[in-house]
Structure formats: C-alpha cells, structure tokens
C-alpha cells in the first residue's frame, strides 16, 4: 500500500432522520477549517430547500476535509453522506460501498430506530469499521449509558468507547475526528492497476453535463483519458476531475483511494448510473466492482396538469428533474377524465411526494395526481404475463388466470405498549406475522410480510398516528405472491372515470367501495340534476350514493290550490331534470381525487 493512501480516510454517517447527522457533518467541516463560522448556520450538505424543510437528506453531497491529527500528520478525510430513508436503500448501499468506515450517530434521547438498523447491517455486510457516536448529550433527557447498552444488545457491536457528542453545542467534535483517523482503516487499492472507480451519485450541471461522484478503487483518472461505463459500454472523454470542498474544486488527477468527481461532457444522467464501474477505455479492468443493480421503480401514479395548457411545461419540468434523478421514470398517458399527462414511476412513497412537491414548487405547476399503484403480474389464460402498472390497462376478468402482487418484509420497531395496536394494523393490511423480538423491556421489533399495495397508501401515517409517532419502519421487497385481486371502477353519472380505478383485494372491495362513494358524494358539488356515483367490479355495481339535484321550488306560486296542479308542475320539473341529466356533464374537482388518497386516515 502506498505511503499516500495511509493518510486517506473515507467514511459515511449513518443516522435516523433527526438524530443530528447534517449538523454533525457541519461541525466536522467547520472544525477542519473549510467553512467560516458565518456559513455554519445552514446545513451545508442539504442542498435542496425541501431537504432542509423536511429535515431529511435526499441528494448525497460528499465533502473532503484536511485534518491535522494529534500525531502530527495531515489526513485527507472524505465524508460521503447517506440518505436515511427507506426509499433510497440502493443509494445508501452504494455510498456505503465507497467507504471503509461509518460513524453511527444515535440520538441520546431516542435510541436506535428501524431504518438505522437496516443501514448498519448493510455497513456490516460491507465490512465497514463502525464508530458509535451518541449525539445530543446536552439535552436534559439524554441517557447515553442506556443508548450504549442498546447499541450493544441490538446491533451487537462494542459500544464501550462510544463517543459522546453534542453537534449543536460543538462538544466532542475533536474526539470524533481523532476516532476517524485512528479507528477507521485506510483504503485498499493499487494505483498501478487499470482504472476502476465506483459511481455513488451523479448530478447534472448545465455547463459540464452529467457529473459522476466516484470513489477511485484502482488506478488513476485524469482529464483527456477515455473512460468506459461497465453497464452500458459507452465511452466518454474526461474533461475535468476534482474534489469537493463542499463546492467542486478541479485537480489534476484522482488516484486510487480518493473520492472526487469526474466530468466527461455526458449528456444524460442515465449514462452515469449509481453503482456502475468506470474503467479506462484503452486499458480496461477485467471485471466491474460488485453490487451494481438497475434501479427499478416500485410505485406508480398518474400526474396530470390541472390546466391542460400546462402539459408542455410539465413535460419540461419532469425532464429537468430526471436529469438529476435517474430513478424517476415517466411516459405520456391520457385519461378520459383528466386529459393528457404522464404515468410516473418512483422508488417509493417519499420519493413520489418529493417529486410532486418539487414540480409544484420549483416549476409553479398545478397538478392532479391519481392514486399510487404498484406493479402487478397478471397471468392470462393464453399463457401471456403482463406487468401491470396502471389499473386502467387491466384485461377483462375472463382473460385472467391469476394475479400476483409484490410482497415486502416489513420491520417495525415500537414501544411495548403499542404492540397490540400495530399488530391489529398489520392484520388489517393483510400482513402475515413472521415474528417478534424484545430489544429491551420497553421496545419490540416486529416482522411482518405484507403486500406492497397495502403500504403505499398511508401505512406510514397510520403507523405514526397509532403509536404517537414512536414507531419506526423499514421494508425490503421479497418477491411476488398470488392474490385474489379485482379492479374497482368508479362511475359518475353512468360514465367510467378511469383516473379513479384501482386494484384492490376482493375481501376489501366492498368496504373500500363504500368509503370511496361516500367520500366522492361529499366532494362533488351539487348540480342542477342528480348525479349517481357508483362503484363496480366488472359489470356488478357494489356501492352507490347519489348527489341530490339543486331545484327550484316550483310550487311557490300555488297558494292552496288543487293537488293535481301541483303534481303537474312537479312532473314537468322532473322531466326537465331528466333531460338535463342526459346532456349535462359533471365537473369533478381536484379535492375529490385527493380525498380518495386519504381514505384510511380517518378511522
């Protein structure tokens, strides 16, 4: 191993939402002198306005610090940030693969959460050295001894010499830097071998094209070289390489063990896939680095402009977002009810919400979104298999042999007093109980096998509301299972509204249909004629509500008078309403669509 590499440390920070990851990162950067005090009020690594607002890290932003350690040497520390949310598990696994060690940051007042667990196990699989850091010790309710014991019991790593810090107050930061130098091993690699570099993120720059964030494993990369991507075989010429001092800082070359960026006038982020290996086109390595997989969208929904004229703007906005987010997929789609729009695929629910919010915020668009759906496998009687991501494309029941739906294994951590409520919730959502273990007297880890379909609506919200926000939840896809599913159609005034169709489990169809028609009745304004709202499976109507007509009092001018006279006027009014109903069209407001997405919250 070269002399140079002994002074490099690559590490990431693993923490649950709100345990103080971004603040700790800020303090480390400040301590190594890369930021003036003036810049430290904001969370440097969280670029998107949305990230700061929600307090979550979505886009990773690496940073390089130089630290003069107590042994008198200068060390190069590369911090690779990781998003802490379940939707971005693959991204996390790639940034973990780029490191040799991890700081496990746990809130001294809260202890370990389910998502932290998932990421720590992933770090252990990649043989990372884990340094436990117990943060927020300045708070009165902090209980570091208890948290140490929990880290040992739950994760099984020694927490005797866990570091006690308060990122907010700047306590213990020096100790963290020393621990990074002394406890995390230097990178392995050989700069004389052919180039191998792992892409762990990328973003789009208007002038330089798609820029890949890489960890160089073997070899050297410098401007003018021709590089090749393993997964696509495409070749590009490197125009610039550099480091991050939070901002891009060009250097002459990147050598093995270092973390930096490569710009090669790549037009599309799709060509710089996360987890892919870059090698020298003229002297390629034999095999790529392990662990690359294509990112597959799990959740789909239709996004339509509320105003039809915004279609082009929506298309442009999605294309711009896609430049920075290769996991977002979309294709044009039309709906009889909503006009032209797009069918979009996302990694998960949070990803979907973030994309929608960014479209509305950054591009000032007014959007209508349909209920989210997952990919079903439909086995037809003629032997064909369909991947169905849109309920409207479901073939007629006579052609279907059976349908399979995606199943996930969910890990839920809850305080003991809420176990009953959560088990009930999971059973409601067709969960199959796999087991439970007590982490300590007060907390339980539950494992359930559940259909993804049941999680994507509002499972997370229901979980939080039943446990007063104390539960944490993580899931991974397990595969497909046969299930008794049907397509539920909604008819308004006798016409099918395709945007409201959804796929549901047969046992729950009636209950769901009842709720939907009641909800729609509340949200569709009254017209001059009555509007039937029906829910149907195939040709069978299973639920109905009627929005009453607005009517004029035609009897106002008959004082006393003959009953037949009144009847005649009422009959005449009825005739008119009937005629009107045949030609009238019903306006369905955006609130009606939104109310259906929020159905189960109100129990």
Curated annotation (Swiss-Prot):
Family matches, as InterPro entries: EF-4, EFG_II, EFG_III/V, EFG_V-like, EFTu-like_2, G_TR_CS, LepA_C_sf, LepA_CTD
Lipid bilayer topology: Peripheral membrane protein
Pfam families: EFG_C, EFG_III, GTP_EFTU, GTP_EFTU_D2, LepA_C
Keywords: Cell membrane, GTP-binding, Hydrolase, Membrane, Nucleotide-binding, Protein biosynthesis
Gene Ontology molecular function, alphabetical: GTP binding; GTPase activity; ribosome binding; translation elongation factor activity
Gene Ontology biological-process annotations: positive regulation of translation
Domain tr-type G: 6-188
Catalytic activity: GTP + H2O = GDP + phosphate + H(+)
EC nos: 3.6.5.n1
Subcellular location: Cell membrane
UniProt xrefs under PROSITE patterns: G_TR_1 (PS00301), G_TR_2 (PS51722)
Role played: Required for accurate and efficient protein synthesis under certain stress conditions. May act as a fidelity factor of the translation reaction, by catalyzing a one-codon backward translocation of tRNAs on improperly translocated ribosomes. Back-translocation proceeds from a post-translocation (POST) complex to a pre-translocation (PRE) complex, thus giving elongation factor G a second chance to translocate the tRNAs correctly. Binds to ribosomes in a GTP-dependent manner.
Record family assignment: Belongs to the TRAFAC class translation factor GTPase superfamily. Classic translation factor GTPase family. LepA subfamily.
Protein name: Elongation factor 4
Organism the protein comes from: Thermoanaerobacter pseudethanolicus (strain ATCC 33223 / 39E)
């Amino acid at each position: 191993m070269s002399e140079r590499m002994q002074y490099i440390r690559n590490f990431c920070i693993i923490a649950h939402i709100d345990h103080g990851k971004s603040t700790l990162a800020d303090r480390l950067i400040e301590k190594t002198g890369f930021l003036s005090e003036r810049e430290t009020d904001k969370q440097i690594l969280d670029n998107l306005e949305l990230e700061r607002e929600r307090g979550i890290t979505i886009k990773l932003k690496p940073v390089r610090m130089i630290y003069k350690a107590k042994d008198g040497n200068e060390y190069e520390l590369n911090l690779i940030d990781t998003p802490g949310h379940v939707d971005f598990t693959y991204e996390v696994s790639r940034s973990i693969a780029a490191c040799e060690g991890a700081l496990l940051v746990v809130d001294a007042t809260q202890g370990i959460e389910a998502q932290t667990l998932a990421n720590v196990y992933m770090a252990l699989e990649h043989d990372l050295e884990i340094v436990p850091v117990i943060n927020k010790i300045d708070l009165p309710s902090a209980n570091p001894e208890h948290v140490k014991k929990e880290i040992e019991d739950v994760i099984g790593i020694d927490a005797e010499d866990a570091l006690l810090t308060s990122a907010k107050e700047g306590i213990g930061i020096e100790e963290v830097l020393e621990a990074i130098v002394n406890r995390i091993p230097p990178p392995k690699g050989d700069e004389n071998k052919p180039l191998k570099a792992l892409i762990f993120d990328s973003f789009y720059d208007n002038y330089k094209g798609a820029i890949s964030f890489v960890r160089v494993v073997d070899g050297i990369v410098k401007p003018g070289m021709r590089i090749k991507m393993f997964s696509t075989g495409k070749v590009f010429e490197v125009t610039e390489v550099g480091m991050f001092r939070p901002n891009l800082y060009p250097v002459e070359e990147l050598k093995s063990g270092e973390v930096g960026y490569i710009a090669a006038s790549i037009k599309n982020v799709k060509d710089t896939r996360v987890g892919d290996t870059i090698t020298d086109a003229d002297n390629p390595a034999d095999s790529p680095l392990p662990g690359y997989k294509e990112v597959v969208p799990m959740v789909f929904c239709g996004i339509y402009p509320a105003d039809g004229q915004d279609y082009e703007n929506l298309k442009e906005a999605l294309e711009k977002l896609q430049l920075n987010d290769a996991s977002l997929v979309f294709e044009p789609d039309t709906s009889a009810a909503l006009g032209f729009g797009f069918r979009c695929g996302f990694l998960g629910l949070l990803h979907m919400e973030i994309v929608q919010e960014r479209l509305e915020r950054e591009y000032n668009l007014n959007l209508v979104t349909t209920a989210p759906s997952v990919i079903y496998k439909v086995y037809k009687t003629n032997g064909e298999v369909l991947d169905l991501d849109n309920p409207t494309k479901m073939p007629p029941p006579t052609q279907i042999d059976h349908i399979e739906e995606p199943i996930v294994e969910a890990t839920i951590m809850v305080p003991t007093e809420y176990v009953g409520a959560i088990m009930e919730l999971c059973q409601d959502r067709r969960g199959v109980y796999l087991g439970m273990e007590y982490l300590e007297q007060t907390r339980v880890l539950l494992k359930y096998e559940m259909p993804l379909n049941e999680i994507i609506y509002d499972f997370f919200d229901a979980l939080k509301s039943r446990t007063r926000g104390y539960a944490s939840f993580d899931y991974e896809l397990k595969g497909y299972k046969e299930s008794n599913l049907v397509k539920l159609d909604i008819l308004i005034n006798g016409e099918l509204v395709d945007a409201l169709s959804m796929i549901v489990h047969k046992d729950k169809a009636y209950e769901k249909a009842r709720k939907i028609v009641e909800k729609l009745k509340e949200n569709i304004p009254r017209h001059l004629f009555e509007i039937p709202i029906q829910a149907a499976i195939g040709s069978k109507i299973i639920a109905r509500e009627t929005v009453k007509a607005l009517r004029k009092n035609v009897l106002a001018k008959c004082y006393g008078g003959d009953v037949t006279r009144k009847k005649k006027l009422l009959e005449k009014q009825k005739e008119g309403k009937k005629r009107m109903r045949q030609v009238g069209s019903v306006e369905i407001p955006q609130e009606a669509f939104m109310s259906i997405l929020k159905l189960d919250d109100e129990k």
